[in-house]
Curated annotation (Swiss-Prot):
<protein>
    <recommendedName>
        <fullName>S-ribosylhomocysteine lyase</fullName>
        <ecNumber>4.4.1.21</ecNumber>
    </recommendedName>
</protein>
<feature type="binding site">
    <location>
        <position position="125"/>
    </location>
    <ligand>
        <name>Fe cation</name>
    </ligand>
</feature>
<feature type="binding site">
    <location>
        <position position="60"/>
    </location>
    <ligand>
        <name>Fe cation</name>
    </ligand>
</feature>
<dbReference type="GO" id="GO:0005506">
    <property type="term" value="F:iron ion binding"/>
</dbReference>
<keyword id="KW-0479">Metal-binding</keyword>
<dbReference type="GO" id="GO:0043768">
    <property type="term" value="F:S-ribosylhomocysteine lyase activity"/>
</dbReference>
<keyword id="KW-0071">Autoinducer synthesis</keyword>
<dbReference type="InterPro" id="IPR037005">
    <property type="entry name" value="LuxS_sf"/>
</dbReference>
<dbReference type="InterPro" id="IPR003815">
    <property type="entry name" value="S-ribosylhomocysteinase"/>
</dbReference>
<comment type="similarity">
    <text>Belongs to the LuxS family.</text>
</comment>
<keyword id="KW-0456">Lyase</keyword>
<comment type="function">
    <text>Involved in the synthesis of autoinducer 2 (AI-2) which is secreted by bacteria and is used to communicate both the cell density and the metabolic potential of the environment. The regulation of gene expression in response to changes in cell density is called quorum sensing. Catalyzes the transformation of S-ribosylhomocysteine (RHC) to homocysteine (HC) and 4,5-dihydroxy-2,3-pentadione (DPD).</text>
</comment>
<dbReference type="GO" id="GO:0009372">
    <property type="term" value="P:quorum sensing"/>
</dbReference>
<comment type="subunit">
    <text>Homodimer.</text>
</comment>
<keyword id="KW-0673">Quorum sensing</keyword>
<keyword id="KW-0408">Iron</keyword>
<feature type="binding site">
    <location>
        <position position="56"/>
    </location>
    <ligand>
        <name>Fe cation</name>
    </ligand>
</feature>
Length: 158
C-alpha cells in the first residue's frame, strides 16, 4: 500500500455539504509554475451519484463553457465516485469566483440554448455513445435549485 497522503482520502466526506467549490491544494512545480486543484462537488457524497451518461455530458459541456468564462483552466476531470469534478487551473481563483462561474455555466446548460453535446462523435470521444443531454440538463437544474456554495462545510450560496 502506498504511503503517499492523498488529500481527497483524508477529507471527511460525511461533513461536506454539496453542491460546493473548494480549493484542494495549490502546487508549485520544480521548474516553476503553480497550479491549483479544486473540488467541484455537485452531489452529496455517499447519497447520490450522477449516472455516467449525464456526468460524461457535463464533462463535455464544461470543457468549452467554463473556458469561455475564465482563463487558465487546464482540465476538468470527473471523480470516480461520480459526485463532481477536479478542476485544475494555472490561475489561483478563490472558491467564490469559481462557484459563480459554475453557477453561470450550469444556467447555460439548463437553458434551452444548449441543444447538443459537443464532440460526441466516434472520432472525438472515447465513449461517444455514453451521453445524455437530458440528464445533464436535469442535474444542472437540480444543482442550481440547491445552490452552489463557496464553502464545503458551511452553506455560502453564491
Amino acid at each position: 500500500m502506498s504511503e503517499t497522503v492523498v488529500e481527497s482520502f483524508t477529507l471527511d466526506h460525511t461533513k461536506v455539504k454539496a453542491p460546493y467549490v473548494r480549493v484542494i491544494e495549490t502546487q508549485s512545480g520544480p521548474n516553476g509554475g503553480t497550479i491549483t486543484n479544486y473540488d467541484l462537488r455537485l452531489t452529496q457524497p455517499n447519497e447520490t451519484a450522477i449516472e455516467t451518461g449525464g456526468l460524461h455530458t457535463l464533462e463535455h459541456l464544461f470543457a468549452g463553457l467554463v473556458r469561455d468564462e475564465i482563463d487558465g483552466i487546464i482540465d476538468m476531470s470527473p471523480f470516480g465516485c461520480r459526485t463532481g469534478f477536479h478542476v485544475i487551473s494555472w490561475v489561483n481563483y478563490d472558491s467564490e469566483t469559481l462557484a459563480k462561474v459554475f453557477k453561470k455555466v450550469l444556467e447555460k446548460i439548463a437553458s434551452d440554448d444548449i441543444t447538443e453535446v459537443p464532440a460526441a462523435e466516434i472520432e472525438s470521444c472515447g465513449n461517444y455513445k455514453d451521453h445524455s443531454l437530458h440528464s445533464a440538463k436535469e442535474w444542472a437544474k437540480l444543482i442550481l435549485a440547491q445552490g452552489i456554495s463557496s464553502d464545503a462545510f458551511e452553506r455560502h450560496v453564491v
